């Protein structure tokens, strides 16, 4: 069983924001994971910081940029969490997954996350059902 978890931005947001629709599910999974490791990349980090400061998403819970960093720092203090730079070979895998004969702005991010997880040998953890069929190891919470 792969204990190297690459969390999608939706899972990070649910861990950081207690009013997220999936917060309880995410926190329970995270607590039960014990000594497993949890990784983020710059893309997922920026996405979460952006969402935390977006009133349309967060409503009255929207954070200032400084408050968003404060929340991120709280979770970053957990020794099981680490940042991963882009792995060697990511560009090739990302291009392979995103060279589609269609127009879909959402596929760019999905292709990137699936490529990152695949090349780095990580399990992608998400609430996004569409990622489950992406050909990488995906845990759907």
Regions found by a protein language model. Give the residues of each.
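Short, well-structured N-terminal submotif of metal-dependent ribonuclease cores
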Residues: 1-40, 55-67
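Histidine- and aromatic-rich ligand-binding microenvironments
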Residues: 8, 106-107, 128, 141
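A generic "structured core" feature
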Residues: 37-40, 94, 139
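Short, conserved alpha-helical segments within structured domains
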Residues: 43-47, 67, 109
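Alpha-helix capping/helix-boundary segments
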Residues: 44, 89, 130-131
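A basic- and aromatic-enriched beta-loop-alpha substructure that forms the phosphate/nucleotide-
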Residues: 50-51
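Active-site neighborhoods of divalent-metal-dependent phosphate/nucleic-acid chemistry enzymes
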Residues: 77-125
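Charged phosphate-binding loop/patch that engages nucleotide di/tri-phosphates or the phosphate backbone
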Residues: 119, 123-141
């Amino acid at each position: 069983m792969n204990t190297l978890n690459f969390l999608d931005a939706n899972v990070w947001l649910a861990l950081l924001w207690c009013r997220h629709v999936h917060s309880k599910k995410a926190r329970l999974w995270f607590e039960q994971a014990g000594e497993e490791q949890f990784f983020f990349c710059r893309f997922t980090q920026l996405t979460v910081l952006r969402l935390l400061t977006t009133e349309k998403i967060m409503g009255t819970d929207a954070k200032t940029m400084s408050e968003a960093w404060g929340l991120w720092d709280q979770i970053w203090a957990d020794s099981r969490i680490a940042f991963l730079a882009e792995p060697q070979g990511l560009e090739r895998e990302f291009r392979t997954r995103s060279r589609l004969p269609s127009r879909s702005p959402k596929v760019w991010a999905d292709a990137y996350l699936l490529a990152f997880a695949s090349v780095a040998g990580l399990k992608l953890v998400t609430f996004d059902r569409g990622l489950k069929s992406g050909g990488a190891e995906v845990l759907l919470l």
